[in-house]
Structures are given as structure tokens and as C-alpha cells.
Amino acid sequence: VLKDGSAAAIYGTRGTNGVILVTTKRGSAGKMSVTYNGYMSISSIANQLEVMDRDQFLANGGNDRGYDTNWMDEITRTPFSHSHNLALTGGTTDFNYRASVSYRNNQGIALKSGFNEMIARFSANQNLFDKKIQIAYDATYRRFDREGENSSYDDYSAFKHAYYYNPTAPVYDETGTIDAGGYYALDIQGYSNPVAYIMQRDRRTKGGLFQGSARVTWNILEGLRAQAFGSLKYSDINKGTYTSREVFNTSSFGSASRSFNTRFNKTLETTIDYVKSFGEHHLVVLGGYTYE
């Protein structure tokens, strides 16, 4: 933890309230070991907002479309999720490492929603010249895929339609008289068939990250230490939306959009510090330079 003048000197206004330096899991000396952990789970909605059923709807003057539909049940499911992590560690006192790969797949409670990602990490520590020089290496690679992103365009809107849509309307247009891809999709008081709303629209976000860094520590003299840290970070985000041409009351051509963004960051930090105790006094001197 860096605070007071030392944080501001190196990190500028970003370090006004202090800086916390985080170290992730690292390797240790010893024989190579392999570990695995994972889990599987299912989820459910603990509580649902109470809405009128068919009988209550009709008793309050609603139009009877001939069916008894629970729209919340139609647009939700019991999702299955699982996660896996495999790690490899080993090395000697002069060089040790840790490598891991993890995968996570979470189904969403709403239809056509979910998230999955893969993360690979590598870290290593190296000691040179009887630990006068220490080097720490880190690298991370991540890819993710999100479907049905929670926003006003997707899940939340579908839930809102499910709360207000006619509970006597059918899910599907069995007569085929409505040109809406087989769904019953007549607007009722400004709301649409929630199932059609989800199934005839797609929203997907894919992206990734690569980050690599190295930290070199030089123990010059007792109490005097110099450090240099450099990192590269690249990320990309690819977003796409699609609306079927069969969506009721929309353009016969449908619609689609796509956006792609990338970011590249470089960081260089150098510090030198001196720590010395004089009887009851303790002296700490720190100087540094940061480029980003």
C-alpha cells in the first residue's frame, strides 16, 4: 500500500487517495504439482412478481384470446452452469512458475441469455546473482462471449412484456394468419409476445484481453532498492445486434448492427527507495517515474 506523498509522486492525481498494489497467485519452489477444481450448479427464481392469471384478467374486463399462459414461465428456464480450473506449479528456489487455465459457462435464467469465458494465466519468478536481481513475469489471456446482455433492449424488456401481456394470448400463431415467424405477436396495449420478443432478436458481445508484464528488482545495497515495471495491455470488444424481418410491426427487411473497438496501453514505472532505521527513528525515501 502506497499513500501520502509517495503515491502522489509516482501516480499523480490518480494516487491522491493512496494506491494498492495487488499480487496474484504465484508459483513456489518444489516438485511439479497439478490441481483441478470445478463446480456445477443450477439456478431458479426465488420470487416472482404476482400478476393476474387468466381468470383474474377476464374478471377485470380483459379480452379473451382463448388460452391460459404464464408468460414468466415461457421466457425463463432452470439454467445449468459449470466452471473448471486447472493449475500447474513447480520450480526451484531460483526459478518457479504457475500456469493455469479456467473455463466458465453460465446459462442465464432468461431464454437466449448466458455468459462463457476462458482465461489462461502464467506467472514466474526468477532470482539472479544470489538474489541481487529478482524478476517477476506475468501474462494473462481472456476471451468471453455474452448473449442476451441485460439491457432495456433485451431481458429486462422481455420481463416487462411478460408482466403486462395478455395471459389469455397463445405463444404461437397456430392458424398461420399472422406473418410473424409462427409466433402470436399482435400488440396488446403496447406490449408484445415476450417469447417472440426474445427469440426474434439477438444481441451478442464478444471480446478479449491480453496483458503481459515484467517487474525487475535490484537490491543494490542493504536498504537501497531499485525497481522497474513494464506492461502491455490489449483488449477488443465486438458487439452485434440483429432483429428478424419476421418481427411483427417492423420493417420487412429487419435490422442489424455491429461495432468493434480495440484498446492498447503501455505502462512503464521505475522507482528507487531507501529504508534505514536509526535507533528509534525510521527513514523511508522513495522516488519514481511513471509513463502510461
What are these regions (language model features)?
Residues 83, 115-121:
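Transmembrane beta-barrel architecture of outer membranes
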